[in-house]
A protein has these predicted regions:
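Extreme N-terminal starter segment of soluble prokaryotic enzymes
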Residues: 1-7
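Short polar catalytic/cofactor-binding loops
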Residues: 10-17
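Cys-nucleophile CN-hydrolase/nitrilase-fold catalytic domain and related Cys-dependent amidase chemistry
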Residues: 17-18, 22, 26-111, 115-117, ...
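CN hydrolase (nitrilase-like) catalytic-core segments centered on the catalytic cysteine
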Residues: 67-89, 160-255
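Active-site catalytic loop in hydrolytic enzyme cores
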Residues: 80, 96-175, 180-181, 185-195, ...
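Short beta-strand-to-turn element immediately C-terminal to the catalytic PLP-Schiff-base lysine
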Residues: 108-109, 143, 223-225, 256
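A short, polar/charged loop-to-alpha-helix boundary motif
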Residues: 120-133, 251-266
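A short C-terminal boundary segment appended to hydrolase-like catalytic domains
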Residues: 253-302
Length: 302
């Protein structure tokens, strides 16, 4: 049995990148001491997803000025921590980019190698993220762990509201999707995450901010794709709860474990997922002419 342990760092954000670096590395040390294979931060840890008035161009300029480079001391500190602690780290930050910064996550493996870099594609242009540039590609990477290789992908917060995000990652071969988050997480969004896991046969781990953050309420999640017991003696199978963990509202480090062997067995034998798709009928899904303009979109102002 290969149990992959993930630390969900549901932590109170810091006022700046330097403070976030110090408290974040300390959290990684605690996670490693408790046997975690991956430490996952909430969305945009470098500035705590600092909300600002998107109608105030001056506030927007200040917000964008807080962006950090992928080779900055902030990011490198987590690369160094991953190597020192023999634990993968998924660190999130407002990334320097032209013409506007990006909302990004970088995953370093336990040897300190950068294996995945993803920038949020579905940015919230109706609020503070109107000061961001969207990413342009979903990707999957092989993460080497103490239990062997795992195919991982990432989507960030609002990405999970679109079924295409998880489906693309599934088509690329993801077994586990890491989801940094920064918003109030309710029952609807929880069920949405369960649906993403079920329909794509992927495991999901999501870290949110606690209720000490203006945009958080905890409720970090771990969701298994295994919705049915595949018992060969029972042709009807048996329903299985997929919500493995839903945390409380306060700050803390929470842990979840995924049985990789069981997930892989399920992926090979359950009918859901990508095997029986009929993509020749899905043309409308990529017809951008059908996308309506959100009339209150501030991105049309800035």
């Amino acid at each position: 049995m290969k149990m992959l342990k993930i630390a969900l760092l549901q932590l109170t954000p810091e006022p700046n990148a330097e403070a976030a670096m110090k408290s974040g590395v300390a959290a990684c040390r605690e996670a490693a001491a408790n046997g975690a294979d991956i430490a996952l931060f909430p969305e945009m840890w470098s500035n705590g997803y600092a909300y600002t008035d998107y109608r105030d161009s001056g506030a927007g300029e200040a917000w964008m000025a807080a962006a950090v480079r992928p080779d900055s001391p902030f990011v490198r500190s987590f690369q160094d921590a991953a190597k020192e602690l023999n634990m993968a780290v998924a660190i999130t930050y407002l990334e320097t980019h032209e013409p506007r910064p990006r909302n990004s996550v970088t995953v370093f493996d336990r040897l300190g190698r950068r294996v995945l870099h993803y920038s949020k594609i579905h940015i919230c242009t109706f609020e503070t993220e109107c000061f961001c540039s969207p990413g342009d590609k979903f990707s999957v990477a092989m993460l080497e762990t103490r239990h062997g290789p795992v195919q991982i992908g990432a989507m960030i917060c609002f990405d999970r509201e679109f079924p295409e995000s998880a489906r693309v990652l599934a088509l690329l071969g993801a077994e586990l999707v890491l989801v940094p988050n920064a918003c109030v997480f309710d029952d609807h969004r929880t069920m949405q995450m369960q649906t993403r896991a079920f329909e794509n046969k992927v495991a999901l781990a999501m870290t949110n901010y606690p209720d000490t953050h203006i945009g958080g309420n905890g409720s970090s999640l771990a969701v298994s794709p295994i919705a049915w017991e595949l018992d060969g003696t029972n042709p009807r199978s048996q329903y299985r709860e997929t919500l493995m963990l839903r945390t409380g509202p306060g700050p803390g480090i929470h842990y979840c474990e995924f049985d990789l062997d069981a997930i892989r067995h399920y992926r090979e034998n359950a009918i859901w997922g990508t095997t029986f798709r009929q993509p020749q009928t899905y043309d409308i899904l990529i017809d951008s002419k059908l996308v309506p303009v959100y009339k209150d979109n501030p991105a049309l102002i800035h």
